[in-house]
């Protein structure tokens, strides 16, 4: 269904139905949206419709859900729970440092383009180590080498970028089935607003939780 066709309203009423008709605990319901604005709107509409029970439903964006879980569980991946989230400017400055270290010109290898390529890899759940398999030419190979350096640097700073949040959640669940099981037990019902917009990493994450 397209934008403005009332999908969010359907999700909110579905949650109310689960709580009041099916007697499902709001604690066992996860509602995911794509933007902070949509998440807070959903929260307030839920509370208006069902009162205090609405506060107990875990309503968040994909990324804020991942931050919440990773703060509790990321030591399983050898990061520390007080990890820093890098914004675009931080990411670009890491890329520029790597270009200098590798004596590569920014004109030939625009940092913004490199970031976009790294982001695409992560959204397809392609890690730095395996990215070189997908290189089609010399330019691609250089990008995958930069990707490897970039991940090493972020890891050494205990830093994550936005795409890491979802990619690392998938890795966390794959490598630690007992952690996945804990959240599968918690989230008996998962509702995703704008589900048609999910990329591969987001789709995989929802599939694992479900």
Predicted regions and their residues:
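Short alpha-helical elements of helix-turn-helix
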Residues: 13, 112, 200-203
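Amphipathic alpha-helical segments within well-ordered protein domains
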Residues: 16, 47, 96-100, 151, ...
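ATP-hydrolysis module of ASCE/P-loop NTPase motor domains
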Residues: 54-57, 75-164, 187
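Generic alpha-helical structural context detector
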Residues: 64-71, 116-119, 167, 171, ...
């Amino acid at each position: 269904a397209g934008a403005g066709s009332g999908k969010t309203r359907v999700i909110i009423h579905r949650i109310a139905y689960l709580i009041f008709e099916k007697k499902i605990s709001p604690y066992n319901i996860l509602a995911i949206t794509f933007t902070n604005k949509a998440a807070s709107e959903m929260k307030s509409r839920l509370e208006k419709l069902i009162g205090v029970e609405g506060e107990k439903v875990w309503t968040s964006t994909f990324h804020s859900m991942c931050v919440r879980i990773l703060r509790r569980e990321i030591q399983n991946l050898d990061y520390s729970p007080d990890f820093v989230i890098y914004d675009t400017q931080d990411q670009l400055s890491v890329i520029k440092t790597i270009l200098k270290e590798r004596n590569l010109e920014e004109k030939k290898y625009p940092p913004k383009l490199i970031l976009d390529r790294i982001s695409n890899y992560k959204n397809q759940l392609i890690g730095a180590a395996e990215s070189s398999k997908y290189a089609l030419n010399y330019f691609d190979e250089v990008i995958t080498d930069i990707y490897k350096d970039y991940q090493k640097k972020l890891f050494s700073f205990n830093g994550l970028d936005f795409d890491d949040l979802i990619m690392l959640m998938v890795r966390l669940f794959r490598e630690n089935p007992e952690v996945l099981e804990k959240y599968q037990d918690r989230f008996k019902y998962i509702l995703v607003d704008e589900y048609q917009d999910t990329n591969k990493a987001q789709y995989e994450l929802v599939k694992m939780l479900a």
